[in-house]
Amino acid sequence: MYKPIEIADRIYSVGCRDWDIRDFHGYSTYEGTTYNAFLILGEKNILIDTVKEKFADEFLSNISKIIDPKKIDIVISNHTEMDHSGAIPRLMQVIGEEKPLYCSKMGAKNLKSHFNRDFNFKVVGSGDEL
């Protein structure tokens, strides 16, 4: 099991390790891979990316070791491949589907298509700042 790691002051790696995967986008992964997600604590608590759906419980447990997941204010989805976004439905169910989910225009379209859900998307474009 992957444990949360504080990588800088109030910034945590909260992803998961998949020991079983042997091929990732054409690369051999004989020792598995990690699904990276990051929690930033501050005026607003921000989560960047999630993990594959089958690791959702472990992912939420990692977050819970740092803060109550319901205290996450903002979720950012960098891209919609399932190793980054698969746990979004479970996460949003836990933290509250009214919480903003920041992503690109195409990200919102893809996430709607993947999950058949209309989360509280906040579309950002190149050069936008949060």
Which functions belong to the PLM regions below?
Residues Y2-D9, Y102-L130:
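Metallo-beta-lactamase
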Residues Y2-I67:
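Conserved beta-strand hairpin/beta-sheet module of binuclear metal-dependent hydrolase folds
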Residues Y12-V14, I46, I76, Y102, ...:
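Hydrophobic/aromatic beta-strand patches that form the interior of the parallel beta-sheet core
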Residues D23, A87-I88, S113:
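Short glycine-/acidic-enriched loop or helix-start segments at secondary-structure transitions
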Residues E31-Y35, K65-P69, V94-E97, N120-V124:
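Short, low-complexity, polar/charged sequence segments that are solvent-exposed and flexible
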Residues E43, K54-L101:
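Active-site metal-binding motif and surrounding structural segment of the metallo-beta-lactamase
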